Amino acid sequence: MDMSEQTQMRGHGLRGELRSDEPMARHVSWRAGGRARRTYAPADLEDMVLFLRGLPDGEPVYLVGLGSNLLVRDGGLDATVIFTHWALRGVRVSKAADGGGEIWAQAGVASPKVARVAALNDLAGAEFLAGIPGTIGGALAMNAGCYGGETWDLVAQVETIDRTGTLRVRTPRHYSIGYRSVVRRCRQLSSVPGDGTRNAETEEWFVSATLRLPHGDGEQSRARIKALLSQRIAAQPLGVPNAGSVFRNPPGDHAARLIEACGLKGRAIGGAAISAKHANFIVNTGGARAADIEALMNLAQQAVRERFGICLESEVQLIGDRS
């Protein structure tokens, strides 16, 4: 960012960090991919509101948390990326007379932190969030789940922000919620970018959620979290850059089983490989390009389709231009 942009930004009361031509590999868990034309790390929600209000009409915008389900293609992203992880990290707990309660968490809070906060406050049902490698915002956007739990099972209400910086409170009835899918009912458009449906007038992003949880035994919850994390460590390639599960599980089956049955475990292209530990993971073994990862995704989809007649659907958001 040059001095004139910095001066203009401060003149509008903005307090965050604006960067140009930012390598998105620094901000996604795959540690691969192209650059974004512009990124902004707001100081807080108020700062994000001001920044959105100042953007030109039609400017493509993406919100990114920990980047755990995201890949920016090597040709880069001609858009503005707003980072939520350091700005939207507030958490509050309110208890009810029956021992249950609610957790309010902003979109940039890591999902495992919410699981720990719930356990510390004797609230049950959020333990599975410890196994989701991303933020609450990302979990809301795709109804992330694991180990028998799904994010929207817990949601009492959410707060969203749109392109004009307008904040709204919405409840689950405003959305069609399914397996790894959340679509706002009123316009039948995705509430998040990345599904191929983009409309500047209707686009909204989650900035917080209120989760309603029953009373539980904190010690049991902590033991459950520990067991889930041990299970995750044993089954998943956590020591190398990855984006978690790459494909949704088809009805009645598992993507990992199908990919492994096609003999693709360990298959490598460039610096990326289908994990030898878990076939629904693609890992960066060193110097992977986004094109390597996408090629492996296409290979797995083609192989499973040809052998089983099943079309694997991606859980990963692919954005940007091919080089």
Labelled PLM ranges:
Residues 111, 115, 129, 133, ...:
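Hydrophobic, well-ordered secondary-structure segments
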